[in-house]
Amino acid sequence: MRARGLSVAIGLLIATEALAGDPVRGRAIVADRQVGLCLLCHSGPFPEERFQGELAPSLAGAGSRWSQDELRMRLVDPARLNPNTIMPSYYKAEGLERVAPAFRGKTILSAEQIEDVVAYLATLK
């Protein structure tokens, strides 16, 4: 299971090597409650967002705490870093349970969106 997560992360890294993430788009994804859903659990530097999560660590300073590769891994396979996490994998489509038919076989975010979020989180020093 862990090897599978690592291979997904490595595959994503290779697939996105040519993609440069856009931090502006990444911020929009993180703040969008219909796309990233990050603020359901996390808080961060989003003064315009009234309700932010308290379940997970703040995103403020994420770029100081983790490298871009570590941020990517946290999005792609968070259970590899913390087996007890409740954070979903944003780039996993197989081996999931209780997935609505409309979402089966689909990732939450595309490879480009993952890179955008990584680029944004890396700016949070």
Protein language model features and the residues they cover:
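Cys/His/Pro-rich metal-binding microdomains
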Residues: 39, 60, 88
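N-terminal secretory signal peptides that target proteins for export/translocation
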Residues: 1-2
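Bacterial N-terminal signal peptides
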Residues: 5-17
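Short cysteine/histidine-rich zinc-coordinating motifs and their immediately flanking basic loops
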Residues: 50-56
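C-terminal capping alpha-helices of c-type cytochrome domains
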Residues: 74, 90-125
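Detector for the c-type heme attachment site
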Residues: 41-48, 64, 76-77, 92, ...
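Electrostatic cytochrome c docking/interface patches
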Residues: 15-33, 46, 57
